[in-house]
């Protein structure tokens, strides 16, 4: 503590007000703790401000534009459809503002003290919060670190006006004529799809042999087919070597199939992963155990090697997902309050807002087989569903991974319209230990996309009505 300084006492101090931190703070307050939350940026973190929410708003706007231009098959002919991109950005910002304002209201409504600034650990019960020229010391009984992550910057692709991270791509002032996306993971696919919908010529360079390596190849193939239809070029096994930036664009050099090639574009978007924000917290002062990737090691209650300090979200091992961070935030807050809460990741869903959307929860078929689990893989296509046909959006399928010995659902994958919403039912099924018969016997409204889960369950039972499997 600085000589002459006074410390403000709190019971639980949360560092970071993203989807993990603010949820942890609210849950801790609900459990009767005096809570202080420290945030150096805007409330809501990356997710609400420059991630999940604005990207989905941009994607939604791009789909509206594409549908307006390409609905001739349904008898809708629209000529001279234009984009007011400044208005798109204004609308996107309004969505963000509503949600961040909502977070502030929730924190204040739960009597959580909000402190602006950067927190540095002095010891296991003290942080120093710096905000510009001012600083304040806080002491705490327990702390929850929820500082999130930031985009990885490649050595030969330093972020600039033309070489963008995801934040830069979300905040462009124009629809670019051309865009090179380095990285075919979920961020690259989502933003590449959005700009392709707006009319941008998009090229995706992926270093691996397939895009969306965390999903099944058949799912990736469907997305690639749709991307090709939009005019997107996907180059796999491509190694991005460097970029030459000009005032009006950038030239990217890459290697593919043993050849060195170049491509010109207005902008380059680099989406090759994220780095945990753990390097500027002073964690070395308190001896918290870390992995060699800068992640904080935690137990099943999100407790670090320092017993009164917890960590959640992108800074701990596991997928960097907002809903995972929120879940861990609740667990950490409850653990501090003495509850026996512990994480269970068996039903954490993953979603890509691609076109069509794809989602997964629990086991993939091959993953289950690799672990020696005898499974039934039951698949039902969107093309056999009345609602999908009425939407004129029939690419994709729903697959259930069912344990053969007892019929319990242990995994599910969906690629198709509204997959992001449909996966929730199957996450519940896995969490509750439900069987394929449980889903098959549940009456699903007709005509809906949700019926596809029931139909796939009937396939698993060998009693499908709307598909021939023999």
From Swiss-Prot:
Keywords: Cytoplasm, Disulfide bond, FAD, Flavoprotein, NAD, Oxidoreductase, Redox-active center. It is found in: Cytoplasm. It is an enzyme of class 1 (oxidoreductase). GO terms for cellular component: cytoplasm. It catalyses: N(6)-[(R)-dihydrolipoyl]-L-lysyl-[protein] + NAD(+) = N(6)-[(R)-lipoyl]-L-lysyl-[protein] + NADH + H(+). GO terms for molecular function: dihydrolipoyl dehydrogenase (NADH) activity; flavin adenine dinucleotide binding. The active site is at residue 446. It comes from the Bacteria. NCBIfam families: lipoamide_DH (TIGR01350). Belongs to the class-I pyridine nucleotide-disulfide oxidoreductase family. Homodimer. Identified in a complex with PdhC. Lipoamide dehydrogenase is a component of the alpha-ketoacid dehydrogenase complexes. This is Dihydrolipoyl dehydrogenase. The gene is pdhD.
